[in-house]
Amino acid sequence: MENKKTCLHGKHVEAGALMQPFGGFDMPIQYTSIIDEHNAVRQHCGVFDVSHMGEITVTGNDAEKYVSHIFTNDIKDATVGKVYYGMMLYEDGGVVDDLLVYKMGENNFFLVINAANIDKDAKWINDNAKGYDVEITNRSDYYGQLAVQGPEAEDVMRGVLGQECSDLTFYTAKTVMIDGVETIISRTGYTGEDGFEIYSSHEYIRKAWDELMKSGRCKPCGLGCRDTLRFEAGLPLYGNELSDKITPVMAGLSMFCKLDKPEFIGKEAIAKQKAEGIKLKVAGIELHDKAVPRHGYTVTCNGKEIGKVTTGYQSISTQKSVCMALIDAECAKLGNQVEVQIRKKSYPGTIVKKAFYQKHYKK
């Protein structure tokens, strides 16, 4: 089956980007180099085409009640414009997807989901809506999305796109009319830096991209550095640090599962795991030597296999060899000594916190 293309696909090809399949789309992995693009976001500003992400709207009299039923975080007292991170769970606590939920109005919610999960999520959201007075619309084909990220992102939004965003704090959003098109701008991102995400029509997303490129103030970035950036910040990737087998408790994300809510799908399983403990846990590991721990590499403790690497890199920002790994929970205590098996050689490492880089968000 042919991969889908975003509304900016032609511009990426024209610019000579390295294109590869990701989440069912033909996406730019890098333009110049992953290191250059990573550093641009950490030091200045980078822009990503993230139009492959999915968008679903939930409206109707029971919209808030229904979103609360399928979402782990608590949206009960949400003001219009608030954005929440959380998960949708199966009854056993496995993760359907992790997502953002935007409250766009009274009983009007905007859900942003992972590209590879669009069809699965849309079906799951519809299947669980029986008995609720809601209208669920998959808008994934309508919206394009840009992520403008980095310490200079606010200046770029103002100076290049004419959008004043100083009123937005971290995890808030607003709707603006641009060229007669309703556009959502939020102060969110997946890089560990300050930044904004823009959801609009394909036509406006193409126009905004051209303006950003023309300005010279914003480097085009591919999904290669999006992964190195999110990894350094300790942010999970669905399929690696979260999955239908890796629960929020195992991933260290149970703070986004509000057990004081009356109910949500999977609540009982999460409460049970928190009370009884877990056998596996996602941990951070820093190697003592320069070697690159890759996804799937074996982690051992005193020669005994205890798990596998979920994501690993030589950190571009710190130059340290670090990884996240799903390992035996009893071995995951900070300071514990483990080994990662890389090309038939054992490299010693220490269990550390999963955030390998200090995040810079505007609170």
What is the predicted function of each stretch?
Residues 44, 92-93, 222, 227:
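A subset of signal/propeptide-processing and intrinsically disordered low-complexity segments
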